[in-house]
Amino acid sequence: DQGEGHFVAKFRKHGVQAESRKREEKPAVIPVFATQFIRQSLQEQPAFLYENSGRIYAMQQPFLKLKDIRILRQGCQIGEVVKNRLEPHQHFYVSNAYGAGMKQCYEMDDAQCLSFLQGQQLPIAGYKGYTQMLWKGYALGFAKGDGMVLKNKYPKGLRIH
């Protein structure tokens, strides 16, 4: 039988290993507008905040720093920094850790819930800013109010038709 000719070798370097220069990691600075948004949104503030590639995460325990292991996501994603403002994320409003502590929320009836899940805006006055949308006590997502209507921020991939 004529094989493919694969070859494996393990090399060992003898001698003194030169110490590599380590880059000093600067701690990521959370933008002021992001901390203000969190302070305005939650009754109880998260203990730890972390920024990675413009995304802000929150946890009650310290974040793990494992340099050799790629960690996809730690904690709850609060939002993403876009053009000097924080664009909130769905995770923030539906998480068990932070969803129950939202300062501004609206309890929907069945008809409003169906409209919300379909991606429609709701004609509800009196709410300004981001509002958590609840149905029978369950957090489904969020909307942004301008005082006259709640504009739906439910993710397009989750909407029903």
Language-model regions: role of each:
Residues 1-5:
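Class I S-adenosyl-L-methionine
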Residues 6-14:
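Conserved beta strand-loop-helix elements of the APE1-like EEP
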Residues 14-161:
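Polybasic, low-complexity RNA-engagement segments
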